[in-house]
Amino acid sequence: MLDLCITGGRVVLPSGVEETDVGIQAGKIARIGPINKKEARCIMNANGQYVFPGAVDTHVHFSEPGRTEWEGFFTGSRSLAAGGTTTYVEMPLNALPATTNRANLQRKLEAAKGQNYVDYSFYGGLVPTNLHELADLSASGVVAFKCFLSPCGSDIPGDFRNVDLNGLRAGMRLLAEKGQLLCVHAEDPSMISQLEAKLLSPVGADAYVASRPVEAEVKAVCDTLAAARETGCRIHFVHISSAAAIEAIERAKEEGVDVTVESCPHYFLLSAEELAELGPLAKCQPPLRPKQEQAKLWACLLDGQIDWLASDHSPCTPDLKDGDFLTAWGGISGCQNNIDIMFDAAVKRRGMPPEQLARLIATNPAKRMNLREKGEIAIGKDADFAFVDDRQSYTLTKEQLYYKNKHSPYVGRTIGCKVRRVLLRGQTIYTEEKGIIGKPSGELLHIH
């Protein structure tokens, strides 16, 4: 006897969209295909909506412990749940202390207990001072590691710091021995420092964008690829914003380098031309690119050259968005709109097949992070689903946001679909009518 049968939906399978049934038992997908409704204890009618696999967001900053006024696991995971993301991997920075050793990871694990509405896991960090702790941190069960090439963090003890190329290579050698994946924020520090030194206060939107050019991203990507060839380390590039960087990564893939790449919805939905009007709310690193560059990035996405999409949800308190474009916090709050905003822009407006979007938001990140139970609608996988109604539009308001600090550059945007129901391991955790349902039931993944 099945616990639940989902019927009446357009199910987004790896092979394409099918109008079929999905049977769930003990939180797992047990059957796909026509089901006699007498074989299920409960029937859920999707009423013609798309049934997507729950999204897997591999790039969020929830800032806990240490900076919980910025977000926190409770509000951050509720935001993900409301948008159809059922699994996340949380970055090692913005929390204090950063996740750069076993003890700091343990503090994060304790802070996360009982707070999450979706399933979760964590990165470890590579910083200049923790090479001797990487093996122990790897054995603690982090799913991957993260480093910055450009300056980051602060002078506060325990905060995250960037590595130089020597530190990058040294860390790569150690991580390669463990078979670990290293995720890299790729912007060239020397190029950025030289350009920032020429900025005149107050720094406007155009000057800020010019201070972190595509060339800085491409150089850092190429330097990292060279280090990967030398060390054999598996690598992943986060939040890539330019087609030129994608082209360099594509060439490396053809040469056999073990590399993947993500981009973020804001690089497809927002442009440098809008930045002055949006203000520091839309400041991010790398910055938004001009529409001409954005069009090239869209071509890369539609052509399958980008492995997946992630939010890079990097929230802060409103006061940190005050000031000019140099001093304001660089980060966008966006994880609640992981699915709907890209379904509208990619599937409805540009004709991307829904199964391709499913690969971008769920299947590919789950595979790369070795989250074997996640990422696709297939027998044996966790019964994580997002129901997307493409027949309804809505305009996003601050009141609809579950973030601790209710600001986002997407507020005021009309989105041509709605996430109307979300299930985690077969249990409904969100509906459009009721909002978040029940108590936190998210589980820690992949820590051993």
UniProtKB/Swiss-Prot annotation:
Pfam families registered for this protein in UniProt: Amidohydro_1 (PF01979)
Superkingdom in the source lineage: Bacteria
E.C. number: 3.5.2.5
Residues that hold Zn(2+) 2 according to the record: K146, H185, H239
Single GO molecular function: cobalt ion binding
Reaction catalysis annotation: (S)-allantoin + H2O = allantoate + H(+)
Pathway annotation: Nitrogen metabolism; (S)-allantoin degradation; allantoate from (S)-allantoin: step 1/1
InterPro entries attached to this UniProt entry: Allantoinase (IPR017593), Allantoinase_bact (IPR047604), Amidohydro-rel (IPR006680), DHOase/Allantoinase_Hydrolase (IPR050138), Metal-dep_hydrolase_composite (IPR011059), Metal_Hydrolase (IPR032466)
Protein name listed in UniProt: Allantoinase
